[in-house]
Amino acid sequence: MTDAEEPFWRAKRLEQMTRAEWESLCDGCAKCCLVKLEDEDTGELEYTDIACRLLDAETCRCSDYANRSERVPDCVTLTPKNLEDIDWMPPSCAYRLLKEGKDLPWWHPLVSGEYEAVRLAGMSVHGRFLFEDEADMEDLEGRIVSWPLMPPE
């Protein structure tokens, strides 16, 4: 890429991206893999610190990405078409940021060139969650956390 060329995430709309470009937008924060609670009356969404059983604790990536939808029926496959209808992506999510016309933050791997920057910036779930099978799923309200809703710096 020359200095005059814009990176693909600035030059293309989400629906124009190739599959590889689309997938590379995921920074690996894994906040979308946390169990979320929705208030039935207000629609307000709250994140817990309980993660999907398929989340790899070290990499913060899905341990069975190709088969995740079959193994976890609630898992959502994000696409440019359904992104508009998904309102629970965290404020730091690249898909959400770009949809809102914002740029990627400094710690995003496509900007920083370092996958670890997400973790070092404190934007990852790494070291801050329990797996579903380790948590008391009857006490989800006791596991509500606010850190996944931190906006990008």
From Swiss-Prot:
<comment type="similarity">
    <text>Belongs to the UPF0260 family.</text>
</comment>
<protein>
    <recommendedName>
        <fullName>UPF0260 protein Plav_0898</fullName>
    </recommendedName>
</protein>
<dbReference type="InterPro" id="IPR005358">
    <property type="entry name" value="Puta_zinc/iron-chelating_dom"/>
</dbReference>
<dbReference type="InterPro" id="IPR008228">
    <property type="entry name" value="UCP006173"/>
</dbReference>
<dbReference type="Pfam" id="PF03692">
    <property type="entry name" value="CxxCxxCC"/>
</dbReference>
